Amino acid sequence: MKELEEKIKEYGTVLPGNVLKVDAFLNHQVDPQLMLHIGQKFAKLFANEGITKIWTVESSGIAPAVMTGLEMNLPVIFARKHKSLTLNQNMYTADVYSYTKKTTNRISISKKYVDADDKILMIDDFLANGQAVEGLLEIADQAGVQVAGAGIVIEKSFQPGAGELKERGIRVESLARIQSLSDNKVEFVKD
């Protein structure tokens, strides 16, 4: 997605450890117009899949997931990272390791919002090693729901996440695919 790649070039910052900081438009400050276009693109890519719900992990996946839900007229469920006093024990849970924060979080989705006949689309801001998507897949397995695929805003193609998901038969659609973050420069995969 050209518009997204331009935003990354203009506002993205490469940090040590192959971390791409995009807090100017995605992870802290959110560009609503860009998120709308991202939602429209995912809606088009997954239009004929019979999707019933969109899942993401809080918090940076919420904006693109909500815009995708808006475009597809579908509810969005975000997996919570922290236990809430308002959420009871009727939860599906999975442990997810965060590459950027170097911590493990237990994510959870209330069973109340999951139906046995659901077909879900997973949306996430980044795909590097695939931990967040793997956590959502684990919850999908527990719930017995079908998975249509994963819509990824930014994929680090030089890390194994996308390849491993595709090997498992998961459809992965990434809007910006990064080949390298060497020398503090973002280099995109050339299609």
Curated annotation (Swiss-Prot):
Q: What is its main location?
A: cytoplasm
> Per its UniProt entry, which superkingdom is the organism in?
Bacteria
Give an example GO molecular function.
xanthine phosphoribosyltransferase activity
Q: Where in the cell is it found?
A: Cytoplasm
Identify the InterPro entries for this entry. Answer: PRibTrfase_dom (IPR000836), PRTase-like (IPR029057), Pur/Pyrimidine_PRTase (IPR050118), Xanthine_PRibTrfase (IPR010079)
Top class in the EC scheme:
transferase
| GO CC list | cytoplasm
List the pathway annotation. Answer: Purine metabolism; XMP biosynthesis via salvage pathway; XMP from xanthine: step 1/1
UniProt binding sites for xanthine: L20, N27, K156
The protein's annotated catalytic reaction(s) are:
XMP + diphosphate = xanthine + 5-phospho-alpha-D-ribose 1-diphosphate
Q: Which residues form a coiled coil?
A: none
Which controlled-vocabulary keywords does the entry list?
Cytoplasm, Glycosyltransferase, Purine salvage, Transferase
Q: What is its EC number?
A: 2.4.2.22
Chain residues that bind 5-phospho-alpha-D-ribose 1-diphosphate: A128, N129, G130, Q131, A132
Q: Is Methyltransferase included in the keywords of this UniProt record?
A: no
Q: Which GO terms describe its biological process?
A: purine ribonucleoside salvage; xanthine metabolic process; XMP salvage
Quaternary assembly: Homodimer.
Briefly state the protein's biological role.
Converts the preformed base xanthine, a product of nucleic acid breakdown, to xanthosine 5'-monophosphate (XMP), so it can be reused for RNA or DNA synthesis.
Q: Read off the NCBIfam families from this record.
A: PRK09219.1, XPRTase
Q: Which family does it belong to?
A: Belongs to the purine/pyrimidine phosphoribosyltransferase family. Xpt subfamily.
This one is known as Xanthine phosphoribosyltransferase
Q: Which organism was this protein described from?
A: Limosilactobacillus reuteri (strain DSM 20016)
Q: What is the lineage of its organism?
A: Bacteria, Bacillati, Bacillota, Bacilli, Lactobacillales
- What is the name of the gene encoding this protein? xpt
